[in-house]
């Protein structure tokens, strides 16, 4: 399901694959690089390596459980500014802190990214996500030191996309 190739210049590339085999893919690329570089063989550790955010115990009833171990860091954000505990819309379970977190730590750069991918709000309730977009844009603009023009552009772009999700 994946291939490791070496170009004439020695560039190692991996093609194909899927999320469920990323550990094997990593092993194959590292082993190929070690051989190409004349390095000693070393046993692969990816099988036992936890991915970022791993949490050994998950309470699926806890708000934000899907952030794993990062959920504690989001709670710390809230402890520094209680207003970040507020939800972004009454019909959505997401907090201001989750938006701020995504900008500061996940390279979230657009309102669409925040509402479609970081929170899935667009998929869960398109109408509510459209209504939440101005607040989300404002939070993001503050975090990124951007002004009203950016907010306006983001809202136009997001509304254009989000209206395709309305019934």
Task: Give names to the regions the model predicted.
Residues 1-167:
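Helix-rich C-terminal "cap"/substrate-channel and partner-interaction subdomain
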């Amino acid at each position: 399901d994946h291939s490791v190739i070496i170009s004439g210049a020695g560039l190692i590339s991996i093609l194909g694959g899927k999320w469920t085999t990323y550990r094997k893919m990593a092993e194959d690329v590292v082993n190929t690089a070690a051989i190409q570089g004349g390095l000693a063989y070393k046993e692969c550790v990816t099988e036992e390596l936890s991915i970022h955010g791993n949490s050994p115990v998950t309470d699926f009833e806890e708000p934000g459980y899907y952030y794993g171990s990062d959920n504690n860091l989001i709670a710390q954000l809230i402890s520094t500014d209680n207003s970040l505990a507020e939800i972004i819309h009454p019909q959505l379970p997401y907090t201001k802190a989750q938006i701020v977190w995504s900008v500061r730590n996940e390279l979230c750069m657009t309102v669409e990214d925040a509402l479609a991918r970081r929170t899935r709000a667009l998929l869960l309730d398109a109408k509510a996500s459209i209504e939440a977009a101005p607040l989300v844009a404002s939070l993001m603009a503050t975090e990124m030191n951007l002004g009203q023009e950016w907010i306006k552009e983001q809202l136009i772009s997001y509304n254009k996309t989000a209206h395709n999700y309305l019934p």
